[in-house]
Regions:
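Hydrophobic faces of well-ordered beta-strands that scaffold small-molecule active sites
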Residues: 1, 23-25, 53-57, 93-95, ...
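Acidic-and-aromatic substrate-binding clefts and catalytic sites of carbohydrate-active enzymes
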Residues: 1-7, 26-40, 62-69, 101-105, ...
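N-terminal pre-domain/capping segments
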Residues: 1-82, 86, 142, 155, ...
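Histidine-acidic metal/acid-base catalytic patches
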Residues: 5-16, 141-160, 164-252
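Short, well-ordered coil/turn segments that N-cap beta-strands
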Residues: 19-21, 47-53, 88-91, 125-130, ...
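Charged helix-capping and loop-helix junction motifs
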Residues: 35-41, 70-79, 107-117, 168-177, ...
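Alpha-helix-loop-beta-strand connector modules within alpha/beta enzyme cores
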Residues: 39-60, 114-124, 151, 209-212, ...
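Active-site groove signature of glycoside hydrolases
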Residues: 85-105
Length: 252
């Protein structure tokens, strides 16, 4: 994934130099906001490096806001992202459900998230982009069900790091894939120690990667994986890439 604080074109080169097959392009401030990037130059840069692209949006867009104007602003910003992603060649774009709306219960928040996605679907369909919901910390199949069950055309974006956070909790990967494995569209990979979203190199935390990757492979999935390791030098990134590829190839 590109670092949104850095120039996108330089991040394309960096992704190619590491040997990635595609760029998980996040459109968010400070340097990669949708209305501030040059989509044509990004597409040219991706094509020059023979990289595919997957669309990613900011995790803090307030789709569940109790203020109509703020919810609408979040939708408008995401529609802007959709337009950019279509121009650069993406066919997938993720969303994070809003889960922090003070003074309102989960049913209200779920309803607002659902409304937001329903308003985004016509633009996504027009542009040929499939929307997918990424699980955040604490999400399991039950917590995502009010939205995903109501929107069968929306895919699952599995974040294995997020699925392994929570004191006293087991991994939520199994429950998510048991219910939505046939809708899996994209996977994020990063390690942690079970307490916070550390974005560590693969093997630096406590996640059982053989168990997690076996669960993914059992669904028949053979799509894209993003190594979402934000900390450490290039050696750790290269190690993580090789570890994931070797582990995936070893599973039957």
């Amino acid at each position: 994934m590109n670092n949104p604080a850095r120039d996108v074109l330089k991040e394309i080169t960096r992704a190619a130099d590491f040997g990635f097959d595609f760029l998980d392009l996040t459109l968010e401030p400070p340097a990669a906001r949708a209305d501030r990037v040059d989509a044509k130059r990004i597409r040219t840069g991706l094509e020059a490096k023979s990289l595919g692209v997957v669309g990613h949006t900011a995790y803090y867009l307030p789709f569940g806001s109790a203020f109509d104007a703020i919810q609408t602003a979040a939708i408008t910003e995401t529609e802007r992202c959709l337009e950019v992603f279509a121009e650069v060649g993406a066919t997938l774009m993720n969303l994070h459900l809003d889960c922090r709306v003070p003074g309102h219960d989960p049913s209200f928040i779920n309803r607002r998230n659902l409304e937001s996605i329903e308003r985004l679907l016509p633009t996504a369909e027009r542009l040929g982009i499939t929307l997918m919901v990424e699980n955040v910390e604490g999400d399991d199949a039950e917590s995502l069900a009010p939205v995903l069950d109501a929107l069968p055309m929306v895919g699952l974006h599995l974040d294995i790091g997020h699925a392994n956070i929570g004191k006293g909790r087991k991994s939520n990967t199994e429950s998510l894939l048991k219910r939505y494995g046939t809708r899996l569209k994209h996977v994020h990979l990063s390690d942690n120690k079970g307490k916070s979203d550390d974005h560590l190199a693969i093997g630096a935390g406590t996640i059982d990667w053989r168990r997690e990757m076996r669960a993914v492979k059992a669904t028949g999935y053979n799509g894209t994986f993003t190594l979402e390791t934000f900390y450490g030098d290039s050696t750790l990134i290269t190690y993580s890439i090789n570890r994931v590829r070797e582990l995936w190839a070893s599973l039957t």
